[in-house]
């Protein structure tokens, strides 16, 4: 195995000869052997690709970086964005809490790759310096938070939202398809008055719609970038106008509406935007957990449960019980939601730990955020494709449950009063008879009036 010698301010370090990273990356590799290698999310590396390219363009426009260096840095960044350098980012999230070592990993790779693109060889002195050129007008303290926002925004907008919208549309379509299917309702897990299966599914569609609105409402805060604040938010060592220009380039390169942060001291010292947006992801997870639970309970059986809906049978459910099929998509969804709840606890805690001018829990915060955003999107697509689109009413079971429910007696309240209606229900329950039989036996309602007043289809309100 061949090595070359790289240097930093602490001295010489051996680096694998064919790798573009240099001394600081290698030190981090050796000092933080914690968990799987290269666990820094790819989305963060991609975000740095946009960021470093934008910085090179802004620095050139403002007269502090020559055109040749700008173009070489941009070429190397384009290779990062094209996933051509994925094996050059070996660092873990368990490193310095500011993300300094990953920032330097990108700086070193861009500098060395730019040198090679210019005809040089690894190990030679590069015309592009990782600090003086690639990191010009920047600090890890403003670049890593900026990369966090870019990565989080892109993941939510390009993945999470479209995937949740897909499932929401399916529930809305099912609500319309099932609008005339009258069934018994349940509160406290006990029988209640009727509603339609369409009305029940309309609640699921509405929950996801509100969750999507909440998520989208957090995006303006998330779109604010810290870049230009440098070390503590003052913008030290940046040319005038740099913060506005560099973010304009990021917006151009990503085709997303990023803006410079209103207050860069807040943008470095706190990550409330990440906490806020993940809170909306938690809200969606809460809704999805409730929906998945409802669906697996409504589908329970096939003969000894509620069994009012039929869900797709995707795979055998047991290694010992022949013919058993389980609500596996519901179970996967609830596990994903549980993971999001755990991630939210981590994010909320580390979000509270910004001391003075900097929060130093950045890598773990963004890793948890990106996992939540990815998992929720993936789970919604999986649930939609393998469960939701195939849900159908179990008409015989719905009819049986509806006719057996004692809570249809509620329709008699306005005619004979609550206490008399309760007497009918309790007597029917005790004797194992029907409401109609006991209403007539007790002399409280005639057969004709019972048939006129107790009509489940008239108890569900508007079907529109």
UniProtKB/Swiss-Prot annotation:
Keyword Lyase listed: yes
Keyword terms of this UniProt record: Cytoplasm, Lyase, Tricarboxylic acid cycle
Sites marked Important for catalytic activity: 331
Reaction(s) catalysed by this chain's protein: (S)-malate = fumarate + H2O
Top enzyme category: lyase
Pathway(s) this gene product operates in, as recorded in its UniProt entry: Carbohydrate metabolism; tricarboxylic acid cycle; (S)-malate from fumarate: step 1/1
Active site per the UniProt annotation: 188, 318
Protein's GO biological process: fumarate metabolic process; malate metabolic process; tricarboxylic acid cycle
Residues noted as binding substrate in the record, renumbered to the chain: 98-100, 129-132, 139-141, 187, 319, 324-326
SUPFAM superfamilies (alphabetical): L-aspartase-like (SSF48557)
Record field: transmembrane: none
GO terms under cellular component: cytoplasm
Enzyme Commission numbers on file: 4.2.1.2
Location of this chain's protein in the cell: Cytoplasm
A GO MF label: fumarate hydratase activity
InterPro entries: Fum_hydII, Fumarase/histidase_N, Fumarase_C_C, Fumarate_lyase_CS, Fumarate_lyase_fam, Fumarate_lyase_N, L-Aspartase-like
Main localization (coarse): cytoplasm
Assembly and interaction partners: Homotetramer.
Additional free-text comment from the UniProt record: There are 2 substrate-binding sites: the catalytic A site, and the non-catalytic B site that may play a role in the transfer of substrate or product between the active site and the solvent. Alternatively, the B site may bind allosteric effectors.
Task performed by this protein: Involved in the TCA cycle. Catalyzes the stereospecific interconversion of fumarate to L-malate.
UniProt family annotation: Belongs to the class-II fumarase/aspartase family. Fumarase subfamily.
Protein name: Fumarate hydratase class II
